[in-house]
Regions:
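N-terminal substrate-binding region of glycoside hydrolase catalytic domains
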Residues: 31-135, 144-154
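Carbohydrate-binding surface patches
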Residues: 345-382, 389
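Bacterial N-terminal signal peptides
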Residues: 13-24
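Short, well-ordered coil/turn segments that N-cap beta-strands
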Residues: 39-42, 65-67, 97-101, 141-145, ...
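C-terminal beta-strand-rich structural cap/linker in extracellular carbohydrate-active enzymes
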Residues: 397-421
Length: 421
């Protein structure tokens, strides 16, 4: 019995070691946005205002198909956090609504605050930011799905351009402290670039160098960008350029997250229906490029002026009314749930994204501009259902099968043809 017990004991020890090794390997593979689990072609987040978001809002966000919400966390300094938001409580509220949090850690455009008096005597701003960021990560690792370090450091609003070298030092300090304290969340992205890094020279070299160093040290798992632009379709080529630049720098494991992007509806520039078209296409082109995470800016309009761009990025009005962008996107999400990308092309000025859901192929068709006739090739005997999302959702027949398929007019307002047996 002793011999048998010893053998069993050794076997159990080996089994335990193997389990630890396998778990460690699984965890390592799971790091980064590539490991995000989602019910949709792209995991979708929406930006919220920590000071005004209600529990009813959070529940409605989840019911609409969003899986994440993004908000900034700032240190307890009046210059950058005048309301002294209770962030731990907000994180709990987000979790209670069955949403995941994207938390952007930001210290102020002087790295620590915005005024000289924010920096206490003898303290280094780099250390103060690192202490704050690492401490907050450590306290909430289990409750936050995605951490983002900084927000648009290539924009003077969020980083004083005179402090580029200091930012590089602050990033290095943060990574060193994370390693020293063994703080290693599954997803840490940076830095929420306003411009496309490594392409075109719009991002200062110090910021690019800081990112590469942080990614190579396994401090940052992914890069985060804010690809604002007049029309969404041009983002596809930019994603490819960025991917190539990351690979060139031996950052093949570094993923791409879109941590902020949206369109405002404001007079006389853009109607609510045009905003809805652009927001919808923003999601589609992100899915087409295989990007795993998109944060839409924003949940609710900031103000009530019809002529202010900054007041009108929401998919909900300031008064809480659903805008056309909300309706179109959320109706699409209901259909696209549990679907995966099959293919994408933009031949002859028509964008075609094909998704597969169960036994159905979902062909989403649109153009960046004028209408174009398009035919979806379909073998005889297949059924086709057409879904329009604008100005409201309508299901109907695709019409008769002609020229080996079903025809539609593609426009700036996407239409979906669902092909099934």
């Amino acid at each position: 019995m002793k011999i048998f017990s010893c053998r069993v004991g050794r076997f159990l020890q080996v089994l335990a070691l193997l389990s630890v090794w396998m778990f460690a390997g699984h965890s390592a593979q799971a790091r980064g946005v590539s490991g995000i689990g989602t019910d949709y072609p792209v995991a979708l987040s929406v930006q919220i205002d920590p000071a005004t978001i209600t529990d009813a809002d959070l529940n409605e966000i989840r019911a609409a198909g969003f899986e994440f919400v993004r908000f900034g966390v700032r240190p307890p300094l009046k210059s950058v956090n005048p309301s002294l938001i209770d962030y731990p409580r907000l994180i709990k509220r987000v979790r209670n609504a069955k949403l995941e949090a994207i938390v952007t850690l930001f210290g102020g455009n002087a790295i620590w605050g915005t005024k000289p008096e924010d920096l206490r005597a003898g303290a280094r701003k780099e250390s103060l930011f690192s202490d704050f960021a690492v401490g907050f990560m450590k306290a909430h690792t289990d409750d936050v799905a995605v951490w983002e370090v900084w927000n648009e450091p290539d924009h003077k609003t969020f980083l004083n351009p005179a402090l580029l070298s200091d930012f590089e030092a602050a990033s290095s300090q943060l990574c060193a402290d994370m390693a020293k304290q063994k703080v290693q969340p599954n997803i840490v992205v940076g830095f929420g670039f306003a411009n496309l890094p490594f392409v075109g020279g719009k991002v200062p070299a110090q910021l690019e160098n800081a990112f590469v160093a942080a990614a190579k040290s396994d401090c940052l798992t992914d890069i985060s960008i804010h690809p604002y632009r007049p029309v969404p379709e041009t983002a596809f080529a930019d994603y490819e350029k960025l991917r190539a630049q990351l690979d060139q720098r031996q950052l093949q494991k570094t993923g791409i997250a879109v941590s902020e992007w949206g369109y405002a509806s404001y007079l006389p520039v853009r109607s609510q229906s045009t905003q809805a078209s652009l927001v919808f296409r923003e999601y589609l082109i992100t899915a087409a490029a295989g990007i795993k995470l998109l944060n839409l800016y924003a949940w609710r309009d900031r103000g009530r002026s019809s002529f202010s761009k900054e007041d009108n990025f929401g998919i909900m009005s300031n008064a809480g009314e659903k805008k056309e962008a909300f309706s179109a996107l959320t109706e699409f999400l209901k259909i696209a749930r549990h679907s995966k990308k099959v293919s994408y092309d933009d031949a002859k000025g028509v964008s075609r994204l094909v998704l597969k859901r169960d036994d159905a192929l979902l062909h989403v068709l649109w153009t960046p501009g004028s209408e174009k006739d398009v035919t979806v090739p379909v073998t005889e005997g297949k059924k086709c259902t057409r879904v329009d999302f604008f100005p409201q959702m309508r299901r109907g027949s695709c019409g008769p099968r002609t020229d080996g398929g079903f025809s539609a007019k593609a426009s700036a307002y996407p239409v979906l043809l669902s092909i099934s047996d």
